[in-house]
């Protein structure tokens, strides 16, 4: 799962639309997963577009750190994932995507605890 997030973040990072902060607006304008009414709402809000786009990108690139993050902070990663995938489910209608990714979080938490025990922190 960490690899899935990281690779997704990497390919977003090399995309000009993600780097310039326009990707969320572009996604909302797609025929398959778009929501033209939502795209229209954020059309003139370039700071919001950039913030959401870059928060998504940074979250995905940093997610592998969940394996090395101590107990209370790991929940911030999981909360970020729930918000990210919840937003995707609501906006794009990808409900099974939400459940598939969130279902892996307990296993990631256990792996995180075991890895931290091995590393001694």
Where are the predicted features?
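A cytosolic-side transmembrane-helix exit/cap motif
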Residues: 43, 95-104, 118-121
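Central hydrophobic cores of alpha-helical transmembrane segments
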Residues: 77-87, 101-105
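C-terminal ends of transmembrane helices
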Residues: 10-13, 83-89
């Amino acid at each position: 799962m960490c690899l899935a997030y990281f690779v997704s973040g990497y390919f977003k990072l090399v995309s000009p639309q993600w780097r310039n902060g326009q990707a969320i607006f572009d996604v909302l304008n797609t025929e398959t997963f778009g929501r033209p009414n939502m795209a229209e709402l954020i059309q003139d809000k370039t700071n919001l577009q950039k913030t959401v786009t870059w928060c998504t990108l940074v979250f995905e690139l940093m997610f592998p750190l969940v394996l090395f993050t101590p107990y209370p902070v790991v929940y911030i990663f999981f909360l970020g994932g729930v918000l990210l995938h919840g937003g995707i489910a609501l906006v794009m209608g990808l409900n099974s995507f939400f459940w598939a990714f969130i279902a892996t979080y307990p296993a990631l938490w256990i792996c995180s605890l075991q890895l931290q025990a091995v590393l001694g922190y």
